[in-house]
Amino acid sequence: MNEIINFSVQELIDKISNSQVTSVEICEAYIERINKFEKDINAWAFFDKELLLEKAKESDAYKKSGKPTGPLHGIPVAVKDIVGTLDMPTECGTPIRKGKSYSQNAEIVDLLTSSGAIVMGKTATTELAYLNPSKTKNPHDYSRTPGGSSSGSAAVIASYMAPLSIGSQTGGSIIRPASYCGVVGYKPSFGLISRNGALKTSEKLDHLGVFGKSVEDIAYLVKELIKKDSHDPATVYYSSSN
């Protein structure tokens, strides 16, 4: 096993900052893991290793230029396939949207990019985030469910195919798969993270949240996502330092 996939987010940040590891090396380590386990787990709705490596090379070149970098520079993050992305399909787990993309990035994707993170691919979801189960298997026992609807987002963390991931919850779609897959899931208080650009199922109940291997890992990501957004009137100002 490549030791890189065992590093905490803090360790990855520090090693990138100190030029001890590159974003390409990090992404290659996760690609190796995906190549080994994805055929059995089916956690990804969309994954293009060439696109990921291209983004990683751009990230490394930007750092090498000496320009200021964001707090998550070069860190790959998986995103649930109900969150709009311009450069990847957003199929929402339904054949109705096969191969279709959103017309703009979701706010959370723009925040990831602004922080320097790399969107590595789209994770599998139950159909329209609440109907038929996804294709994903529980990484600990392929005969069991990973839980839904954020099935892939939990499974990629449990199987070490990504260091961090974005999920969503309307009923129990973060906390349930986190529990089933044995990872940490964070469903924030309503209004902390913008839902603009993600599939809507309930204006008053929809949340976007985060999966990771530890509370500390999740904290690094959540800190960059808690922002007031004029396009999501539910969002409120809240200092991420709290």
Pin down the residues of each PLM region.
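Residue-level signal for the nucleotide or nucleotide-sugar donor/cofactor binding architecture
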Residues: F7, F47, S151, D206, ...
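Immediate post-signal peptide segment of exported/extracytoplasmic ligand-binding proteins
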Residues: S59-P76, D217, N242
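Short glycine/serine-rich loop/turn segments
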Residues: L72-L208
